[in-house]
Amino acid sequence: MSLIREIAGGPYALAAGPDGAMWVTLVHDGAIARVGADGAVDRFPVADGSRPSLISAGPDGALWFTRNGDDRIGRLTTAGELTEFPLSEGSAPFGICAGADGALWFTEMGSGGIGRITVDGETSGWASVGGTPSMITRGPDDAVWFTLNQGNAIGRLHPRDGVTMRELPTRGAGPVGITATHDDAIWFTEILADKLGRIPLDGALQEIDLPGKPHAVVADPSGGVWVSLWGADRLARVSADGDIETFDLPPGSEPHGLAFGPDGGLWVALESGFVLRMPD
């Protein structure tokens, strides 16, 4: 099954909700959209200039998202109830993920920090890492892993171990997207170097050439990863062995966020104004 829905406002990132719908940030309109299993679209205004960016399902059954434009974390229930939690001015939160500890972890691009927020809304600044931290994911080791877009490194944070950094071999790589796969590895994109990286928990860092300005990356439940090629209007599927298959999108699509839906289908946010479910 394939599905495409026109949604104005700059669809940027997606997450599957516990209600069987896909939830989408609209970065230009300051809103969140819900795409139901039947394809119906509902919009939930957030605030002008809020720039909702990344979104994650929380352990409390709500959707949590970063408000990069007005320094807040947002929480939206599946019933449409919105709550906001202010952060320090200029923090510019961006990436967010659910951690192993039952809290949400997020990056602060502006202040260079990694933050934590409980489902009750208690926020804390956990680490100052610099380097413009971008996206963040829970790793197979229950740490959170994140990209340092201007620091040219991958970071790992665990409350027990603190912060460790892995410098990238390619200078000026501009890492952005990051995800964990079931084979105990961390995958990440290098948008400025046209590469995809992989860090096995028990091995050395690897890089694969992947032209097209790779942006977001998501683990494929059947193995390997999917990558949005923002600069080429394509998607790429990369196997665990490094084999690459690409899929063309309409010109000017600007593919960004990727997420698998409750039905097992791959969904893509196209900043040009569409949300696409890829054919099975």
From Swiss-Prot:
Record flagged with keyword Flavoprotein: no
Record key words, sorted: Antibiotic resistance, Lyase, Magnesium, Metal-binding
Magnesium is among the record's keywords: yes
Secretion signal span: none
GO molecular function: carbon-oxygen lyase activity; magnesium ion binding
InterPro entries according to UniProt: Streptogrm_lyase, Vgb, WD40/YVTN_repeat-like_dom_sf
Leading EC class: lyase
E.C. numbers: 4.2.99.-
Annotated binding of Mg(2+), by residue: 254, 271
Family annotation (Gene3D superfamilies): YVTN repeat-like/Quinoprotein amine dehydrogenase
UniProt-annotated catalytic positions: 256
Cofactor(s) required, per the database record: Mg(2+)
Xref: Pfam families: Vgb_lyase
GO biological process: antibiotic catabolic process; response to antibiotic
GO cellular component, one term: outer membrane-bounded periplasmic space
Binding positions (substrate): 215
Oligomer status and interactors: Monomer.
Known function: Inactivates the type B streptogramin antibiotics by linearizing the lactone ring at the ester linkage, generating a free phenylglycine carboxylate and converting the threonyl moiety into 2-amino-butenoic acid.
Family indicated by similarity: Belongs to the Vgb family.
Family matches, as PANTHER family: VIRGINIAMYCIN B LYASE (PTHR40274:SF3)
The protein's name: Virginiamycin B lyase
Gene this chain is encoded by: vgb
